[in-house]
Amino acid sequence: MEAFSFGSYYPGDSAIHRLDPRTKLLLGFVFLITTLTVSGFRGLAPVAIFVVLIYAVSRVPVRRVLSSMAPLLAIVVVVAVLNLFTDQSGRILWQLGFLRISEGSLRSAAFMACRLTLMMAGMNAITLTTPTLDLTAGFERLLAPFARVGLPAHELGMIMGIALRFMPQFATEMKQTADAQASRGARVTGGPLGGVRMLGSVAIPLFTGVFRHAETLSAAMDARCYHGEQGRTRLHALAFRRGDALAAVVTMLLFACVIVVNLQLV
């Protein structure tokens, strides 16, 4: 928990850091669509190279990347386990009643785990290289055209920004609550059953603390006379630059490579 940093910005001045947040959000969406269209392990190769290239250019330390990804690996494990029982093609390797694990299910589980890990790594690069306020501003600007039809663009951007800021806070609160319960004699470690018991002793004080932080944030916004977008100005104006165009070209090349590989696999 102490190393949890997903959603936390890592300061830097790389080419990735300098990209417009709108470019990162749009290309992040294209990256997700591209990764979802991959239909085989060979298609994951250009995606993996693309992700490695992003982190190499951003110059974010490997240790920081791994620490920010570690809490998300539980999702990868759950998805992989579920896929173990979906594809029953190939030779049956293990069977217990109606539960079967075959060669096809192993391939499916490994493929889904790799694809989901790459998707998370790609999106994690956005939060590591973009301040939360810039992400909020970029998201709000992208939704601005829809404000004419009644979509609350500013409010949605604010919600996203607060959610990203609260991720590390939530993890810190959970760590502090678990330590406090342990100091009072509660068992907060020890295998899967220990994890379930920990949730029972940590959940109520954890959510109490989260609601307290939410009330404090609400009071702080009221004290600063926050009334939404009205009268709000920005220190740095968003602007597309040459680097944004280059990033778009590279992402489109990735999409083209994945399409070509998929056609070869058909």
Model-derived features with residue positions:
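Juxtamembrane/interface alpha-helical elements of multi-pass membrane proteins
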Residues: 69-185, 189-192
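Hydrophobic alpha-helical transmembrane segments
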Residues: 25-26, 44-46, 66-69, 73, ...
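Transmembrane alpha-helix interface motif
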Residues: 1-41, 47-58, 141-151, 155-158, ...
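Membrane-interface helix-boundary motifs at transmembrane edges
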Residues: 60-66
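A diffuse structural propensity rather than consistent per-protein peaks
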Residues: 61, 101-102, 241
